[in-house]
């Protein structure tokens, strides 16, 4: 039996959460304590949960051993872990749950079948921002029995890297470019906890990606959502003058596009109607005259 303490904190951003159709989804794998792990979520509830009341209308979230079949007989992992459902508007409203468990071949999954009622998730402001749900997992392996030569390299989607005090997912180049072009972007940023910083940065990157698209590719809902995201980020202390200007330009272009499209459709309809009138006149002019005997003789 080997004693060791190995820990890792990962962030899982679930996009388009409200429109997910799958009964369950899982994160990419990550390595802690010579073991591959992943998070598994049930967006509409775990129908196999022990307690009937937990089976529906709750977000269920679990920590799973991803490579359990590869371990030797008798393997175990004594693990302490926490799962945080991030409220991106107020860290005080974030939901933290903790557990300690011996994982083995009979018990490869541990978690929380009622992390939060879905009604609370969808109605409370801050958990879902731009359709994204952010989860943070801290996994500490306290004791190891049975080792495998597993790669320490985790999926780049999961690892976080420090950039100007922000623990960011591997959009590191995008974040570096933001800070290089806008040095004071976060000079008045208030939240201090790492997972809150990560959540805000994810919103900022998503917003930047949205505003880089052509107005033609954006719906009015997209533009409205971008405006809400700007307000949300500005209230946290981000300085985003250039994005606000970009958002205003996109709104104006979208209005002009819609006005021009409406006028074009009106003109096409008018031309079509006029064409129908002239078509009828042409057909009438081509029609042969009918003659009877009284007209001829």
UniProtKB/Swiss-Prot annotation:
The keyword Coiled coil is assigned to this record: yes
Record key words, sorted: Coiled coil
Residue ranges constituting the MATH domain according to the UniProt record: 7-139
Coiled-coil intervals: 239-281
PROSITE patterns with a match to the protein in the record: MATH (PS50144)
Entry-linked SUPFAM superfamilies: TRAF domain-like
Record Pfam families: MATH_2 (PF22486)
InterPro entries referenced in this protein's UniProt entry, alphabetically: MATH-CC_domain_protein, MATH/TRAF_dom, TRAF-like
Signal peptide range: none
UniProt protein name: MATH domain and coiled-coil domain-containing protein At2g05420
């Amino acid at each position: 039996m080997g004693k060791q303490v190995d820990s890792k904190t990962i962030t899982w951003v679930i996009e388009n959460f409200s429109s997910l159709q799958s009964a369950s989804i899982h994160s990419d794998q990550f390595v802690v304590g010579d073991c591959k792990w992943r998070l598994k979520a049930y967006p509409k509830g775990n129908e196999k949960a022990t307690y009937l009341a937990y089976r529906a209308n709750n977000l269920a979230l679990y920590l799973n051993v991803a490579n359990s079949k590869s371990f030797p007989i008798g393997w175990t992992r004594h693990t302490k872990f926490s799962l945080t459902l991030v409220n991106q508007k107020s860290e005080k409203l974030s939901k933290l749950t903790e557990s300690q468990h011996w994982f083995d071949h009979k018990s490869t999954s541990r978690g929380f079948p009622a992390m939060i009622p879905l009604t609370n998730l969808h109605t409370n402001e801050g958990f879902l921002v731009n359709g994204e749900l952010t989860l943070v997992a801290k996994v500490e392996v306290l004791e190891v029995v049975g080792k495998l030569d597993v790669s320490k390299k985790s999926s780049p989607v999961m690892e976080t890297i420090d950039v100007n005090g922000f623990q960011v997912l591997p959009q590191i180049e995008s974040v570096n470019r933001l800070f290089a072009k806008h040095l004071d972007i976060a000079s008045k940023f208030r939240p201090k906890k790492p997972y809150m910083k990560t959540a805000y940065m994810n919103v900022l990157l998503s917003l930047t990606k949205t505003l880089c698209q052509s107005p033609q590719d954006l719906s009015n809902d997209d533009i409205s959502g971008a405006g809400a995201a700007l307000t949300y980020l500005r209230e946290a202390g981000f300085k985003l003058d250039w994005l606000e200007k970009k958002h205003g330009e996109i709104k104006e272009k979208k209005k002009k596009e819609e006005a021009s499209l409406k006028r074009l459709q009106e003109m096409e309809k008018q031309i079509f109607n006029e064409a129908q009138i002239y078509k009828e006149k042409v057909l009438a002019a081509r029609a042969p005259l009918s003659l009877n005997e009284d007209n001829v003789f």
